[in-house]
Amino acid sequence: MSNAASAPKKVVLAYSGGLDTSIILKWLQVEFGCEVVTFTADLGQGEELEPARKKALAAGVKPENIFIEDVREEFVRDFVFPMFRANAVYEGVYLLGTSIARPLIAKRQIEIADMVGADAVCHGATGKGNDQVRFELGYYGLNPDIKVIAPWRDWAFKSRTDLLKFAEEHGIEIAKDKRGEAPFSVDANLLHSSSEGKVLENPAEPAPEFVHMRTVSPEDAPDQAEVITISFEKGDAVAINGEAMSPATLLTALNAYGKKHGIGRLDLLENRFVGMKSRGIYETPGGTILLVAHRGIEQATLDRGAAHLKDELMPKYAELIYNGFWWSPEREMLQAAIDHSQRWVTGDVTMKLYKGNAYLIGRSSPYSLYSEKIVTFEDDHGAYDQKDAAGFIKLNALRLRLLAGRDRKFGKN
């Protein structure tokens, strides 16, 4: 047992009910002799969560110290949708499905710690990945004095065999398929699924088809395209085909469309915040459709200057989320600017879904800046005087003409 003076008295553990966090729960009890409070979040990962309650009770956790919460609506409304207002993608392609879930889990752990008087929080992220950073930046960003326990960095176990031995010694149930090495590691929520490690660690080898759990193969998707209409209000999707939906219900529906048509697969070799490159197989079916649709309604409603500035800000915004700085002032500053840009982002977008692709085929908005009267190739009846373009071009060409004159006189250095 650790030094009694520094040992936590009560710990809020992010608990899935799986083997690893069940081992962590028992390790906390054995190592520190502390009281453990479990928090299990329903983020739309598609798993039955009540077994987590039974496992926690079997491990000696008091009933009043077991928190199982459905946070799907909060997750989509307060985290996913704000991120999609920014069109955020990391390194050009990754829709940040794992990254965006961590701030909410950290927030609820801190809130529960305050509620029950816990002096520490604990997560099950390994010492090699990004999640340890995301969780802990979240904890400290919300409670600067909280004690953080990261078992994968602290305990003495050297191998999976050591973990399984500890589990057996303490009566922790081990599923038969967990006795050997699992083929890959999975994280899932309502926005996406990610698979990493083991059979995926050679980036030259194609990922086995069985890794993909959220989407059919594009080759096996229907031969008939499907057309849907997504409605937006102030940057957030609010309806599909005219049917109003809550944020989580809408994303669930888009996931079903994306799954059916094989949309949202990504094989990415990404740069982790901790310094190494890692390979991830991501599936973000509904999010991929939503991103294309949101950019489509912005095409009609955002001014060029605002749209281009927003695109310049996006990589920084995405990097902040990827690295775990959701609760930072710079993310909040960027969010304020992004949200301000969405005041007029209202209207309908028509999408065609077909064999792995989400095509934007139409958009309309009462606040559209598109003027058919001005842009027409036919007679615009004086709406736009083409002669004005000559002066516009001359003024913009002035510095280029001066540079060209010098180059022609003295040659280019």
UniProtKB/Swiss-Prot annotation:
Q: Which reaction does it catalyse?
A: L-citrulline + L-aspartate + ATP = 2-(N(omega)-L-arginino)succinate + AMP + diphosphate + H(+)
**InterPro entries cross-referenced by the UniProt entry:** Arginosuc_syn_C, Arginosuc_syn_N, Arginosuc_synth, Arginosuc_synth_CS, Arginosuc_synth_type_1_subfam, AS_cat/multimer_dom_body, Rossmann-like_a/b/a_fold
The similarity annotation says:
Belongs to the argininosuccinate synthase family. Type 1 subfamily.
* Gene name of the encoded protein: argG
The uppermost taxa in this organism's lineage are: Bacteria, Pseudomonadati, Pseudomonadota, Alphaproteobacteria, Hyphomonadales
Report the leader peptide range.
none
Q: What is the annotated quaternary arrangement, including any partners?
A: Homotetramer.
User: What name does the UniProt record give this protein?
Assistant: Argininosuccinate synthase
Q: Which cell locations does it reside in? A: Cytoplasm
